[in-house]
Amino acid sequence: MPTIDALAERLDEYLEPAQVKAVRRAYYYAEQAHDGQMRKSGEAYVSHPLAVASILSSMHMDHESLMAAMLHDVIEDTQVDKQGLEDQFGITVANLVDGVSKLTHLEFKTRAESQAHNFQKMAIAMAKDIRVILVKLADRLHNMRTIGAMRPDSRRRIAKETTDIYAPIAGRLGMHDLKIELEDLAFAAYHPMRYRHIKAAVAAARGERKALLQQVQIALEDCLDHDELPGLIGGRQKHLAGIYNKMREQSKSFREIMDVFAFRIVTNEVDTCYRILGAVHHLNLYRPVPGRFKDYIAIPKSNGYQSLHTTLYRAGSGVHTPIEIQIRTKEMDDIANHGVAEHWFYKNTNSRAQRAHN
């Protein structure tokens, strides 16, 4: 369980001392406001807003977002009203907390309704301040991580709402890491037996493919070393909900879904991305698959995602397993994983650097 001291130490890495102090003050205020309240898990209630703030800190969110995270249930669950928060913490934080409270009251009954009327309400809230949505997504993520304390019927309802509403919104905002964790947690809560079966099958498949994956990894590393190109190479794992959904929607077997090797190469500069692409397209024994190259650096996706995508195959081996490769810069990788939250961080970092320069 996180502590306020541990969180403050992490915040010292990217926030000003006065901002860290303000986050601490919001925590102690929430601790007092929620005094005597407990979570269904038996923990003190303040452990939840602290965990939500910790999630946002991993996205490098600003101090006002973290303060709102600490206070996000105060209006809903205590005697404190919006004016009281405004008096203590200012209009911006009060508006953020009020926005999160209003989103909490939205009821999502069907997928069609959620995509129409209620999604429009969320879009309006996003237009006012995107941070309202980010706090709400972090709130939902922690609730999903601790959903085991809920009754089975509540778990299924919350899991469906997470799959239908919150995971797609995270996807629209380019927050890939958060989206797939929400989807996997919801899958585990809604279909626990299917989740366990696929998890076991994935573990077995990864063991079988370990030697082949190492061969491809070594070939890619040798390729970059030979051309003196900087890059970190890592494997990409398919998440369990994604595997299940592909099996169901595309009528594919588990082996067909898993029969793909996936790698990501992260480098320093945009120019280097294209040089790495040229190098991997000329690998010994491997050839690019025609028609499978995508340049999302030149033409980014609507959510800001940027990367080069290509697919290789082992020439003349009789093994037709595709090797999917993504190539991107560190900043592109951060934005691909954290979406608008990372945009926010880079914008604020650049603003602070400019102020220091002036």
What does each model-identified segment do?
Residues M1-L15:
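Short, contiguous pre-domain boundary segments
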Residues E16, G42, I75, A112, ...:
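Hydrophobic alpha-helical scaffolding
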Residues Y45, G84, L106-E107, S114-Q120, ...:
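Phosphate/adenylate-binding "loop-and-lid" substructures adjacent to NTP/NAD/dNTP-binding pockets
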Residues Y45-A201:
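Divalent metal-dependent catalytic cores for phosphoryl transfer on phosphate-bearing substrates
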Residues M59-H63, I91, A127-I130, T163, ...:
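Short flexible coil/turn linkers enriched for glycine and charged/polar residues
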Residues Q79, E107-A112, T146-A149, I243-M247, ...:
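Short acidic, glycine/serine/threonine-rich loops at helix termini
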Residues N245-N358:
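Long beta-strand-rich cores associated with HINT superfamily self-processing modules
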